Structures are given as structure tokens and as C-alpha cells.
Amino acid sequence: MPGVASGQGTISVPNAYGDYYFGKNKVQFENFKWKIYHSPHFDIYYYTEDEELLQKVVSYAESAYDQLSQEFDFQIKKPTSLIFYETHAHFEQNNEISNFIPEGIGAFATPVRFRMFLPVDMSDPELYELILHELTHIFQYHMLFGGNLGKGIAGRPPVWVMEGMASYMEGEESARDKMFVRDAVVNDQVPPITQAGVGGFFAYRFGYSVFEYMEYRWGPEGMRDFIVELRNTVGGRVGRAIERAFGISPEEFDADFRRWLRKRYLAELLETGEPGDFGRPFRAHRGIRAQNTSPVASPSGDFVAAFTNNRGDVDVVLYETKDRTFFKNLTKGYASDYQYLVAQELTMGRNMGRDIAFSPDGNSVAFFARKNRGRELVILDVIKKKIRHSVEMDVGQQFSPAWSPDGNSIAFSGWLDGRYDIFEIDTQTGDIVNLTDDDVYDGAPTYAPDGESIVLTSVVGGYQKLFRI
């Protein structure tokens, strides 16, 4: 799911990729020629020449407005400004936030002039959810603060209220989203609702569960009653709003909420088991907690390459499969060669597929790295820890590389002409071919063992489906 800015103008994203990039300089490469499109409820600022893309954004924004206005029983009197960018690389160049914006931050909304800023290089379902999320913040600013920024700063509802409500309005949680709350339930670490310090990505998931529980117990009007009482409570005190909306104390709410969570997740845990029941974890260093993502086994099966953030930087490391121990860091010292590695859940939001690929002989790995205005394909010698090739492309937002069995090609997903397709690059000549060239969102390519076909994931009708080309 995408990271977003909170109602206070501060950005709440998973700690794995949030704080690391703040303070870094923002560089503007393009000079966009902005135009304005007026729809019933929006002033939409755009520069794209793709009329179909513009109309899609307009349609999604108006549909999201209709959905939220009915849910909240509230109308916004003036048009909302929506500024959209064709890609995240373009979105990073906005003038609203002075700091560099990492790819883990998907969009943001501001309470000053009720404006939404977002990129649109994603699948249609994700784009609609993103617009729903940011527009929920706009509704919050109007409903809770009455358009009064001073009141919003003074009230300052907890992050979980602002982000949890916006996440809840998006719709169903993913399995990964549920994992955060399930882990808190199993380890008895569910915080009280009056605890203001709940932040990071957990604030999104915790808040989602709170609003889900409200609707489960008090129906759709429960959330509306809570919003009304929170607006009328001095200082945005959640506990007082709970008492007025539901007639129970915050302590009673917490107890019932925890009981509901335990019934939901502990039964699920008994059915599925714990991670340790299925295997031993890979650890870079004993006693140090770190995230490891995009694991891929070497052709021999002796090693696993993965992204890790155990030393602050995000690196590609090798683990020995036999004893699950750290073997070596492949990218240590390469910070000056690129801005960061393209690693889902670490430097960017979750998408699909893996972000590392082994060559058939096991001597090289391929991944994408951010450099200047775009991404480059990096081919790294595993033995010498040296970059063999670094390839710039006209294709943008590349991710999920896959190496062909003969070693001559690398397939990947990338953005070109307003959509994501599967591309293939010749590792010797650098020539690139668009393999799909269709109107759906394509990602996660994988070569068949004989190299004669590629299996990929396409988002069709809101669902991810497998295809072979």
C-alpha cells in the first residue's frame, strides 16, 4: 500500500524508508506546462498530453467524491485542487514539500489550501484507492477543522485517527497489512486508543482496525458519530470523543476492541501456525533486527540474495542457505554510484515480483537503482563485488528484473506512454523491446525454464491474473 502525508503535513511512512531520505536535496529536472481542468468538485492541474489519462483521473476523483460524501454525509462547498504527475519521478519535483520525497511516499494532501498531490503511474485499482485516501484527508480537514488550520494544529488528532480513517476508506486490507496488527495482537502490544505516540506504518494499520471495529459494533453511523464528537472536543481528545459518541469509557472501548482482535487473529494463528514452524530465519547479524526483502536463490541453491537495511543503508547481501547466516555485502561502498536501490517495502511501496535476479551461471545479480531523474539497470559481479554494467533507459519506473535461462536477456516491468508493460533488454547490445504493449498493468515477469516463454502478472478488471507470452 502507498505511504501518504498525514493531516499535520508530516509524512508517515514505514520507518524502513521514511526518515533515511529526509534532509536530502530535491532536484527539479523538468519544467512542466500546467493546465487546469474544471470538474464538478475538482480543479485538476495536469501537464499530460494523454487525454485518456486525464479523463481517467477526473472520473476516479469524482467517483471517490461521491463515495465519501455519501459515507460521511457531508459536502465540500468549494472545488478541491488535485495536482497529478505522470510518474513518481515527476511527483518528487513538486514545490509543496522542500525535502526530497522517497518513492515510499505515494502522495500527500495539505490542509492549507485543500490540495492533493499524487503520481498516477500505478494500476487502476491502486490509483482509485490512492485518490480515496488523499480525498479522505481533504474531507477530514473540512469536517474536523472547518477549514481552520489553526484549529487543526491546536486539535491535532492522533496520526492513527487521520491515517487509519483514510486507510479504512480505501477498502479491503491486504494480507501484508493484516500482518502488522496480527503481530501486535499475538505479542500483546496493542496500544490504547488514547496513546498519541502511535506512528509509522503501524498507525495506518492500527487505525484501520479501530474504525473497522467501530463499524462492526455500531454500524456505519458509528464512525460518523465519532467524527462529530471529535470535532466538538477541545484539543482533539480521543477518549472524550469515545465517551460522547458511544457512551462507554476509553478503557471499556480498549478492552472490547482487544477482545475482538484476539478472537479474530488468534484463531487464525492456530490455523496457519507461526513462521518458525516452517523454517529458520536468515539473520545478517545476531541480535540486530532488520528487514530482508526480495529473496532469490542462486542457481546452485547455495546462496540467497536479498535486500536488507540492517546497517541503515539498503544493500544487496548474500546469505548461505545451509546455516541461514550472512555471507557478504555486495553493494557496500556504492552509495556514490546511485541514490538508492529500488527495493519494494524498503525504498518504495509494495508492488509485485522480486527486485533481484541471478544470472544463470550465478556469477552476477541484476537490480535497479535510482540515479538522478530515473532508474538504471545495474549488473553486479557477485565474486568481485564490482559493477559490470549500468544501463540508462528511456523506459521509466523499472522494477522486477528476471534473467533469461541463456543469460542473453533481462525482462522487467516499466512505464512508457502512460502504462506499465513488460520489456526485454539484450544484455550484450542494450537493445530494448516492448513485449506486451497493451493497456493493462503488467509486472513480475518470469522466464520459463526453457526460455521460450514468459509468465507475467496483469491487473485485469481489478484482479491480478497470470498470463504467458
Describe each region flagged by the PLM.
Residues 11, 15-18, 25-26, 34-36, ...:
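Beta/coil-rich, acidic/histidine-enriched accessory regions frequently appended to metallopeptidases
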Residues 288-291, 333-338, 393-398, 438-443:
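Short coil/turn segments at the loop-to-beta-strand junctions that recur within blades
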Residues 320-323, 381-385, 426-430:
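Short loop/turn segments that connect beta-strands within beta-propeller blades
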